[in-house]
A protein has these predicted regions:
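Intrinsic-disorder-associated, low-complexity terminal segments enriched in Asp/Asn/His/Tyr and depleted
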Residues: 3-6
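Short, positively charged and aromatic/hydrophobic N-terminal segments
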Residues: 16-17, 22-27
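N-terminal capping segment at the start of a domain
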Residues: 49-65, 212-215
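Cofactor-binding active-site loop characterized by glycine-rich and histidine/acidic residues
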Residues: 59, 71-194, 200-201
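Thiamine diphosphate
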Residues: 147, 151-154, 159-262
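Glycine/aspartate-rich loop-and-adjacent alpha/beta segment that forms the canonical ThDP
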Residues: 250-310
Length: 310
């Protein structure tokens, strides 16, 4: 007799009826199977980012709960990694030589799920099952979902996990790289700095930490909860190669990730300045949408605004 967990994760693919509100932007017959795709232009990445934002707000609205703000702030970061930087194979999620992406701020899982769907790890229709009781797409990323590398929940753990993965790759003489996305509020956690110290001690140069510096945590401003400044100097003091960039500028993101590959003997930290809720006027830089789903009227407005960006 299987327990309930086994039943959830070994079930057949769900039959999903997507409400007539809108269908997800991905066309399943155009899914890529080879990454990274160096042929993608910056304009094509920008166009994909708009579609990804539309899918994020739609799935959260349909799920009735979720974290839109921190998902929308990280779109360009994940699009750069999944489409242009990381070696990965949606047809073989456990490919031994893959690069790994660790979502430490796992409540922002909608941005990860949508990228995984756009890459072909699972059908895009499954996005409509977000937070449903029998879904693989829960409110925090789970390792049994195809393409997810770490089960998340408690903040502060992802950098330690990523460090272990990077060390393991080095011991096995693999050229795999590990990318960890951290929230800036998450940097309040002491475990982040323990991992940061250990990473330089072991000279782990195949590890990159990216801080989504959107300035908001939960329902208020990070500076009012715990002042992190000077954040970049903190990472430098721990011995990391550290750069500060515009986290919505594809050129800056891709350049910083490429430069990180050239750094030897130390890990790299990228402090990416972003706007929570980026791309949607009433969500942008608004703490209210840290963890609140848009209602139907708000969703229609959000989709209209995003369509106007095309």
């Amino acid at each position: 007799m299987k327990n309930i967990t086994d039943q959830l994760w070994t079930r057949s693919e769900p039959t999903v009826i997507i409400p007539p509100l809108r269908r997800y932007s991905l066309l399943t017959n155009s899914v890529q199977t080879s990454f990274p795709d160096q042929s993608l232009s910056t304009d094509e990445l920008k166009s994909r980012a708009i579609d990804i934002r539309k899918d994020i707000v739609t799935m959260i609205a349909q799920g009735g709960s979720g974290h839109p703000g921190g998902s929308l702030s990280a779109v360009e970061i994940l699009s750069s990694l999944y489409f242009k930087v990381m070696n990965h194979d949606p047809q073989n999620p456990k490919w031994d030589l893959r690069d790994k992406f660790i979502l430490s701020k796992a409540h922002a899982c909608p941005v990860l799920y949508v990228h995984l769907a756009h890459c072909g790890y699972f059908p895009s229709a499954e996005l409509a099952t977000f937070r449903k009781i029998d879904s693989r797409l829960q409110g925090h990323a789970h390792i049994k979902t195809p393409g997810v590398e770490m089960s998340g929940g408690s903040l502060g753990q992802g950098l330690s996990f990523g460090l272990g993965s990077a060390l393991s790759a080095r011991l096995d003489k693999k050229e795999s790289r590990v990318y960890v996305l951290l929230g800036d509020g998450e940097c309040d956690e002491g475990q982040i700095w323990e991992a940061a110290m250990a990473a330089t001690h072991y000279n782990v140069d195949n590890l990159v930490a990216i801080v989504d510096r959107n300035g908001i945590q939960n329902d208020t401003w990070t500076k009012d909860v715990m002042n992190l400044e000077q954040l970049a100097d903190k990472w430098r003091a721990f011995g990391w190669n550290t750069v500060e960039i515009d986290g919505h500028d594809f050129t800056a993101i891709l350049s910083s990730l490429e430069e990180a590959k050239k750094v030897k003997g130390k890990p790299s930290a990228i402090i990416a300045s972003t706007f929570k809720g980026k791309g949607i006027s009433f969500m942008e830089n608004n703490p209210d949408f840290h963890g609140k789903a848009p209602n139907q009227e708000q969703l229609q407005q959000a989709l209209s605004e995003l369509d106007n960006l095309k």
